[in-house]
């Protein structure tokens, strides 16, 4: 896969949540919500200011991130599902 996000956009692969609760109950696919955690797969060069300077993205490939429930746009590349979103949509980095 060769996709390079533009400006401050980030390509994220969702990290699937556990399908079993702590009590041992399995959650069916129909009851699961989309995960709000993911791993960064690709990062754009950064956002350009009005005077032409580039503000680099503060994230890197491999970072595990938390994002909003409705953040980003779902896309499919070579059969795999990804999200493409702006750096502002990222709520935090999971360390």
From Swiss-Prot:
Q: Which Gene3D superfamilies match?
A: GroES chaperonin
The cross-references to PROSITE patterns, in alphabetical order and at most eight, read: CHAPERONINS_CPN10
- What keywords were assigned to this record? Chaperone, Cytoplasm
The cellular location(s) given in this protein's UniProt record come to: Cytoplasm
Q: Per its record, what are the GO molecular function terms?
A: ATP binding; metal ion binding; protein folding chaperone; protein-folding chaperone binding; unfolded protein binding
Name of the protein in its database record: Co-chaperonin GroES
- Provide a GO biological process annotation: chaperone cofactor-dependent protein refolding
Q: Name one Pfam family in it.
A: Cpn10
Function per UniProt: Together with the chaperonin GroEL, plays an essential role in assisting protein folding. The GroEL-GroES system forms a nano-cage that allows encapsulation of the non-native substrate proteins and provides a physical environment optimized to promote and accelerate protein folding. GroES binds to the apical surface of the GroEL ring, thereby capping the opening of the GroEL channel.
Under the subunit heading, UniProt states:
Heptamer of 7 subunits arranged in a ring. Interacts with the chaperonin GroEL.
Q: Which family does it belong to?
A: Belongs to the GroES chaperonin family.
A Gene Ontology cellular component where this protein is annotated is: cytoplasm
Primary localisation category? cytoplasm
């Amino acid at each position: 896969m060769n996709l390079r996000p533009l400006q401050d956009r980030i390509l994220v692969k969702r990290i699937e949540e556990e399908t079993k609760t702590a009590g041992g109950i399995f959650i069916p696919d129909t009851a699961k919500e989309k995960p709000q955690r993911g791993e960064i797969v690709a990062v754009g060069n950064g956002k350009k200011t009005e005077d032409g300077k580039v503000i680099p993205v503060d994230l890197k490939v491999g970072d595990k991130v938390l994002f909003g429930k409705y953040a980003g746009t779902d896309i499919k590349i070579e059969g795999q599902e990804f999200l493409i979103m702006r750096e502002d949509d990222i709520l935090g980095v999971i360390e």
